[in-house]
Amino acid sequence: MYIVQIASECAPVIKAGGLGDVIYGLSRELELRGHCVELILPMYDCMRYDHIWGLHDAYRNLEVPWYGSSIFCDVFCGWVHGRLCFFIQPKSSDNFFNRGHYYGALDDHMRFAFFSKAAMEFLLRSNKRPDIIHCHDWQTGLVPVLLYEIYRFHGMDHQRVCYTIHNFKHQGIAGANILHATGLNNDSYYFSYDRLQDNFNPNAINFMKGGIVYSNYVNTVSPHHAWEARFSDISCGLGHTLEIHQQKFGGILNGLDYEVWNPEIDPLLASNFSVKTFGDKAKNKQALRERLLLETDDKKPMLCFIGRLDGQKGVHLVHHSIYYALSQGAQFVLLGSATEPNLSKWFWHEKQHLNDNPNVHLELGFDEELAHLIYGAADIIVVPSNYEPCGLTQMIGLRYGAVPVVRGVGGLVNTVFDRDYDQNHPPEKRNGFVFYQPDEYALETALSRAIALYKDDPVAFKTLALQGMAYDYSWNKPGLQYVEAYEYIRA
């Protein structure tokens, strides 16, 4: 198949979060399966040009209809670690992608509406006719709308669209001016509940809703999160829309890049290890203790948290887990940063308060090298999220022999299976500890079981860690599932 991914990110050249990693990992897996994959991306001024090989002109002066007139673009082509990427650069006083950042501008809706329009115009004018157009999140939610309402009448009538929702919290809610800009000119037609009208604000359109309504297949990034999106408020008002379109809606778990996250060859570890050489994991623990000036005591399990310090990640439970671990004779290492000033101030205060404690270290910020070493060193990884569409932290922890303690939400449900209580997996397939209520008591019940197993039965704890390492959370299975979805909507 010929597949074109249209997205606002692709790691490592454009990466603001996990979306970029998914775009790159999925594209590579699809190519390994023999498919032709191309990517269309914005040409941000702040992207990592050093990761692009052979950047050159692909299409000069692409004319993109806009507000009854036109904006001209140049399209550049280059290779990003083996992926063929096209970058759209508008020549306009609006400077849509020359802002010094990827997101956060007041006119983000206009910026990405234009990107969607330009991507479709590029496919049309360059005579590219992919079998599948795969779009991601609200930024490209208008692509299937434009394809169906405009471009199918210009020879693009056999393309099928897969639309993946990575985060329901950002949906692209905008006014009617977006419709006029992109050439979707019949307000009464588009401002209807079964098309683009926002489910909460009847005077606004919703990019993500448009993606759901007009695409041939819609998915989110784990099966359980797909269920949550339909039957809880986690979809932020789109639950009824998903119910209407339930026959084309599902969940496909994200994969993990096993070239980056591989304890057998990871150059950022103090000592590489595998299932067969699991004992060498302890050398990473010792190296981390020496680096962070922590006490050396092999009887103490090392717990860790790696991630953003915000409400989505269950920050109040992260904070509680630090003190609970210390009260149970364990060590705790945190690596993360808070974007909200009050949370940042709170954790800086905690860092100062705990600075002289030899069993805890709070590293506020992000350090890729340190993250790898923490994964390699940790015995237990804590993931107490309030909301987790997929989650990669627990997958990396499992890969590196760190037993996860997680809250049973989203993709955590599909990847971590409680050692004591999971009834859907035999004991030899269980790999962690799960709690469900978002409170301190529930967290403590799971943490206490994990810490007690480490202290009281080291052999059983090692067995559990090895069972986690045996799971395959690479892109292999998700890649196959996406191919099956593509083939289904092409049939």
Swiss-Prot record:
GO terms for molecular function: alpha-1,4-glucan glucosyltransferase (ADP-glucose donor) activity; alpha-1,4-glucan glucosyltransferase (UDP-glucose donor) activity. Gene3D superfamilies: Glycogen Phosphorylase B. It holds the Pfam family Glycos_transf_1. It is an enzyme of class 2 (transferase). It catalyses: [(1->4)-alpha-D-glucosyl](n) + ADP-alpha-D-glucose = [(1->4)-alpha-D-glucosyl](n+1) + ADP + H(+). Its EC number is 2.4.1.21. One of its GO terms (biological process) is glycogen biosynthetic process. Keywords: Glycogen biosynthesis, Glycosyltransferase, Transferase. Pathway: Glycan biosynthesis; glycogen biosynthesis. SUPFAM superfamilies: UDP-Glycosyltransferase/glycogen phosphorylase (SSF53756). ADP-alpha-D-glucose binds at residue 15. Synthesizes alpha-1,4-glucan chains using ADP-glucose. Belongs to the glycosyltransferase 1 family. Bacterial/plant glycogen synthase subfamily. This is Probable glycogen synthase 2. It comes from Synechocystis sp. (strain ATCC 27184 / PCC 6803 / Kazusa). The gene is glgA2.
